[in-house]
């Protein structure tokens, strides 16, 4: 899934009833957690012959570079799931220094989203604490993550979430730990009428770099 931000874009939607038009207007008035003005999206699926994570990421990076060169395009980025259209899920996650006193011993996170560089900025998702991903993170030895407000307030209530470790649960204990570097504003992932849930953002560029050095 790719997102492009344009400086000037005219979108014309023809509807057949005033009620539908009013419904669309009302939905757009809801704060979804990101800036929906001037965004155009499309999906891309690479053929099976595209080899491994490294090959796929390089294709995406090349595509984004070319999109950014188009006149009128201010930025372009990519992610694995589009906000407002991502299904609610449940990913077991080890969360260090978890302050909750109830619930399962291994909490479940609703959304894991792998994003390309510049995703939060392109989408207009504010960082409420800490920082966003930086270009230097791609070559950093330590894996980093950005989480949303709901996750931080749920599992690190009363504590500073910045610097806290978490990782996807695995039975073989081989999943890497990610250090939280930033808290992003809540984004409605499953629809404007749904709660934001708990969410983790991981940087695709960093996953690609880790994969390259492990070979």
Stretch-by-stretch model annotation:
Residues 1-6:
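N-terminal Sec/SRP start-transfer signal
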Residues 9-38:
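Alpha-helical transmembrane segments
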Residues 12-16, 59, 112:
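Residue-level signal for transmembrane alpha-helical positions in Major Facilitator Superfamily
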Residues 30-57:
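Membrane-interface junction motifs in transport/secretion proteins
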Residues 58, 64-215:
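Mid-to-C-terminal secondary-structure elements
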């Amino acid at each position: 899934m790719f997102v492009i931000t344009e400086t000037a874009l005219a979108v014309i939607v023809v509807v057949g009833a005033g009620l539908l038009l009013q419904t669309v207007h009302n939905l757009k008035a809801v704060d979804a957690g990101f800036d929906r003005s001037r965004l155009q999206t499309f999906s891309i699926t690479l053929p099976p012959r595209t080899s491994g994570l490294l090959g796929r990421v390089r294709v995406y990076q090349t595509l984004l570079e070319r999109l950014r060169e188009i006149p009128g395009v201010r930025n372009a980025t990519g992610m694995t799931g589009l906000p407002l259209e991502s299904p609610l899920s449940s990913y077991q996650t080890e969360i260090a220094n978890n302050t909750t006193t109830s619930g399962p011993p291994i909490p479940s996170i609703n959304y894991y989203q792998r994003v390309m560089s510049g995703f939060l900025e392109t989408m207009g998702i504010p960082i409420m604490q800490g920082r966003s991903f930086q270009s230097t993170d791609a070559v950093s030895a330590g894996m980093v993550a950005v989480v949303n407000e709901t996750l931080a307030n749920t599992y690190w209530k009363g504590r500073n979430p910045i610097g806290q470790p978490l990782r996807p649960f695995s039975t073989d204990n081989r999943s890497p730990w990610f250090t939280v570097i930033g808290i992003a504003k809540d984004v409605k992932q499953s629809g404007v009428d749904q709660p934001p849930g708990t969410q983790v953002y991981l940087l695709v560029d960093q996953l690609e770099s880790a994969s390259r050095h492990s070979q």
